[in-house]
Amino acid sequence: MTKKRRNNGRAKKGRGHVQPIRCTNLARCVPKDKAIKKFVS
């Protein structure tokens, strides 16, 4: 399989689980480390 990026677009690493956050310009629930901080409401 191709792998887009090594960290899957997240800042997690050794953490195992991060709580989702209501995120970005869309009202989607996204893991806290994956949400682009610019748009976080």
Curated annotation (Swiss-Prot):
It is found in: Cytoplasm, Cytosol; Cytoplasm; Rough endoplasmic reticulum. Coiled coil: none annotated. InterPro entries: Ribosomal_eS26, Ribosomal_eS26_sf. The keyword Membrane does not apply. Signal peptide: none annotated. Keywords: Cytoplasm, Endoplasmic reticulum, Ribonucleoprotein, Ribosomal protein. GO terms for biological process: cytoplasmic translation. Belongs to the eukaryotic ribosomal protein eS26 family. Component of the small ribosomal subunit. The ribosome is a large ribonucleoprotein complex responsible for the synthesis of proteins in the cell. Component of the 40S small ribosomal subunit. PANTHER family: 40S RIBOSOMAL PROTEIN S26. This is Small ribosomal subunit protein eS26. It comes from Neovison vison.
